[in-house]
Amino acid sequence: MAKFRPSNILGDPFALMTISISILAWLIAFISSIIADVQTQYPNYSWWAISYMFCVIVGLVTTFGTDTGHVYGVAIVGYLACGLVLTSTSANNLIYGKQASMQAAGAGFILLSMIIILWIFYFGSTPQATHRGFIDSFALNKEQPGDPSYRGSRPMSSTFGARPDTVATNNTPQMYTSAQLGGFETSSPVSGYPGGAPGAERASSAPRFGTPNPSTPGNGEQEVGEVPQPTEYPYRAKAIYSYDANPEDANEISFAKHEILEVSDVSGRWWQARKQNGDTGIAPSNYLILL
């Protein structure tokens, strides 16, 4: 299990605000319920609602502190939905009471219901959702994509989809070296015949090895699959997570959380981006938010 870090809560405005308000609302409901139970007959199921919400708040504090909301999001939403029913029912029966203590308890349950709705909206959405990405962008200590638990839970690698044609993935001619071809170099554009079309003079290709063609780059100068880079980057995006490029793919680009990137095209799931230092490459769009 991930280690509990108080900085995950203190550095996350959303977590700090919702947890603080939920604790305050729970205390209001709890203390007012004690007073109301002494003064008049208090509904027993509201005590169960208070006990249940205590467990939910403790669980949410643990979840925010360990930054494992993306792991247990489905279970959290289920528990919150049950809690919303309990708090809403209690609020409806207490807010209309004649005693001030019962009305105060009802107000506490109303605040709890409002916080639960916010939590359901947050945990019930995927990390790629726009509103969740915006909320997480203010957090200082969110779990990084390089962590094993992060890669195993986020749908980045399994469901993100294939990349569109980019710098080195366009349909460019396949280039081979002379050693790879083993002497079967083609001296003409005709495909399927080593050395050119049938009947062509094979001796005509001999000067190619001694006199380089000025219009053809020398050996070692040809870039495999090279396509001109885009010259305009009209969009600006902010990284909501850090991303480490795949070492096996030279097209990907690494960037840090909160880093500002320039983007040339935002139509696909992989965006052609340029960093402030001039490095260019492709970046996953669900790690970025447009400015």
Curated annotation (Swiss-Prot):
Topology, Cytoplasmic side: 1-14, 66-70, 125-291
Protein name according to UniProt: High osmolarity signaling protein sho1
General function of this protein: Plasma membrane osmosensor that activates the high osmolarity glycerol (HOG) MAPK signaling pathway in response to high osmolarity.
Region (Disordered): 145-173, 187-231
GO cellular component, one term: plasma membrane
Ranges of residues in domain SH3: 232-291
Membrane topology: Multi-pass membrane protein
Keywords, sorted A to Z: Cell membrane, Glycoprotein, Membrane, SH3 domain, Stress response, Transmembrane, Transmembrane helix
Residues on Extracellular side: 36-44, 92-103
Family from the record: Belongs to the SHO1 family.
InterPro entries, per database record: SH3-like_dom_sf, SH3_domain, Sho1_SH3
Sugar-modified residues: 44
Assembly with partners or alone: Forms homooligomers.
UniProt-listed GO biological process terms: regulation of actin filament polymerization
One matching Pfam family: SH3_1
Transmembrane domains' residue ranges: 15-35, 45-65, 71-91, 104-124
Compartment(s) of residence: Cell membrane
